[in-house]
């Protein structure tokens, strides 16, 4: 209760106030400074740390190129000749990226002057897209090799902290979500010295030691046919990797939680989820894709679009796989997210089925003031959207005599308007 804590909000981190904040952190003896993920990048990194990572990435790129040249020289039939022009362009890109970072830093006070001795990152999986070099080609499951600016910035901060014997703590429930390479990145963040001691700084060396490429048939992006895929998807030497991981990880399992509090995780009704299946309308079927006699799918459908995107590089403004899957998610929820003017048909609407289910549960439990939690991943109001105002109506006495199902239908109809981004526009207060 007596801790001296600074909570940074968006007003403190504006360009006008930023320098004041940096001085405030540097010149006060705070026990903790709490800052949002989105603001962390605005805390400058030491120039020597940035220069050091720049040189390391250049050396890594050169090493990978030399390995590719040697592999081609030893076995030209099995290995592709490395593209020297592409290699030089990569070096230029790395230099340009770090020069831009240094220029953006300006003359701000950096974290080395702020007295930071412990960095604790909640939801650390949001920083998993750390850039890396690899000579592995046409291998799925490697993750995002380009990385993100957010991850690179955090990596710069962890490098500074490691070099100065400071502390780092990551908190996450999903250390590995999409790719085995995320374990490698976690080790780069938290135990870089352990990787160096074992000669595993390069991803390729780490992957050969702890991973395995599996060849198998997989559904293509359209989910209509199979293709052979080489995927980095299997751990090897699990015992050795587990020992490295447990050297820095404090693992809390669901069983551990239940030992301390047997009722912490509520029991699922019926011991398993209840799947509510809603029939697909003709509009949704056409939008997803209907097979034609020639084996193709109707023009403009999701499957048709995904087949056309297969194997193509994403270009700005053009259709891509992510856009297709986003549209597929929208139409799977409610066709009105695709066509706001479409008529709501009860038997084909998941949102209607959900609302009806929630209302039925309400009728069963309202006498004991039962509580429900509803989760929906699409078409939810954002902070900048219209606010919903719930007030006790003047005619409260009349509500007792109304038909609850009719009211539910009217409520659903009133929520049938969406903005251009597919977000629900709440009914006005009037």
Where are these predicted regions, by residue range?
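Conserved helicase motor "Helicase C" RecA-like lobe of SF1/SF2 P-loop NTPases
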Residues: 379-430
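Inter-lobe coupling linker of SF2 helicases/translocases
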Residues: 18-64, 82, 86-89, 93-118, ...
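Conserved strand-helix element at the start of the C-terminal RecA-like helicase core
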Residues: 314-318, 368-386
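Conserved RecA-like helicase motor-core motifs
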Residues: 2-13, 195-199, 417-423, 427-430
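Conserved helicase motor
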Residues: 8-18, 36-42, 377-379
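Basic, amphipathic N-terminal segments
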Residues: 59, 66-81
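Walker B catalytic acidic pair
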Residues: 122-123
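A mobile, often basic/glycine-rich helix-loop segment
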Residues: 133-148
């Amino acid at each position: 209760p007596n801790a001296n804590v600074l909570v940074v909000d968006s007003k403190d981190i504006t360009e006008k106030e930023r320098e004041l904040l940096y001085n405030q952190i540097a010149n006060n003896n705070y026990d903790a400074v709490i800052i949002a993920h989105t603001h962390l990048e605005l805390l400058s990194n030491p120039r020597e740390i940035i220069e050091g990572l720049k040189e390391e990435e250049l050396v890594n790129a050169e090493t990978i190129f030399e390995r590719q040249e040697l592999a081609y020289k030893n076995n030209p039939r099995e290995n592709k000749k490395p593209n020297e022009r592409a290699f030089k362009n990569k070096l230029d890109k790395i230099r340009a990226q770090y020069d831009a970072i240094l220029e953006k830093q300006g003359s701000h006070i950096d974290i080395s002057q702020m007295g930071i001795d412990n960095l604790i990152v909640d939801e650390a999986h949001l920083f998993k897209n750390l850039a890396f070099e690899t000579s592995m080609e046409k291998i799925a499951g490697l993750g995002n090799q380009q990385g993100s600016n957010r991850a690179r910035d955090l990596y710069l901060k962890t490098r500074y902290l490691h070099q100065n014997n400071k502390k780092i703590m990551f908190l996450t429930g999903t250390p590995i979500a999409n790719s085995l390479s995320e374990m490698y990145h976690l080790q780069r963040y938290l135990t870089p010295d352990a990787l160096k001691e074992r000669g595993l700084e390069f991803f390729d060396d780490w992957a050969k030691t702890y991973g395995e490429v599996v060849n198998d048939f997989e559904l293509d992006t359209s989910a209509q046919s199979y293709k052979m895929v080489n995927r980095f998807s299997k751990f090897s030497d699990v015992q050795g990797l587990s020992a490295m991981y447990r050297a820095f990880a404090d693992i809390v399992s669901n069983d551990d939680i239940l030992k301390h509090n047997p009722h912490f995780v509520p029991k699922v009704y019926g011991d398993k989820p209840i799947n509510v299946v809603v029939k697909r309308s003709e509009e949704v079927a056409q939008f997803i894709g209907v097979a034609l006699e020639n084996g193709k799918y109707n023009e403009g459908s999701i499957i048709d679009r995904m087949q056309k995107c297969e194997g193509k590089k994403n270009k700005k403004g053009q259709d891509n796989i992510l856009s297709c899957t986003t549209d597929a998610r929208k139409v799977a929820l409610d066709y009105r997210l695709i066509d706001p003017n479409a008529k709501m048909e009860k038997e084909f609407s998941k949102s209607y089925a959900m609302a009806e289910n929630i209302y039925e549960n309400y009728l069963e439990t309202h006498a004991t003031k039962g509580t429900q939690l509803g989760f929906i991943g699409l078409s939810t109001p954002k902070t900048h959207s219209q606010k919903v105002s719930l007030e006790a109506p003047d005619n409260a006495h009349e509500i007792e005599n109304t038909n609850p199902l009719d009211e539910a239908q009217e409520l659903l109809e009133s929520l049938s308007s969406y903005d251009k981004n597919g977000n629900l526009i709440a009914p006005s207060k009037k």
